[in-house]
Amino acid sequence: MAFVGPTGSGKTTIIRLLCRLYEPQSGQILIDDIDIKDIPIATLRNMLGVVLQDTFIFSGNVADNLKLNSNLDNLQLENLCYELGLDNLLKKLPEGLNTSLRERGGNLSSGERQLLSVARVVIRNPVVLIMDEATAFMDPSTEATLQKDLERILSKRTALVIAHRLATIESSDKILVLKGGSLVEEGTHSELRLKKGLYFQLSELQQKGFVNF
């Protein structure tokens, strides 16, 4: 599922509500029919995997960056990387999982850093994967390449994606269009294009290079 809308429409607020950084003034947020208010905050946040637009790669090797505090051994990690389709990336690196990385991933491209940051969260196997404008700082060419990897990683997973470039969420099962804190449209990319509403307008403007939100 993807959220789109102009700046200030409430996209990031929804993510903060889901993480219980804010509490809703009315209504409910349910995960598997359970009100998140009934889930201890620590448990809830362990259920969620959040990828933000600002990635952080620390100095160390690739394996350490991916495992963090998990108990995975390198063989398990290699198998997971293969399942996630990271083998092509690892083949590019001189020592694969043992390749040393500079702080903030200075020896990786922006797309490679983002792919590792997404994989790091996915490896935890969260109940819900949340991506908050995770490709915001990429040029369109890098983003298009990364998008193919993300579509494979996100398949068969529950994912909420906040998008600033509409081309990245065209394959989403459902797109929710927000404006001024309200839901104004919902549907697939094709359905929303046919409605000729706000989504259509934003899509047309963005294709012409006028809007990037």
Please tell me what each predicted stretch does.
Residues 1-213:
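ABC-type nucleotide-binding domain
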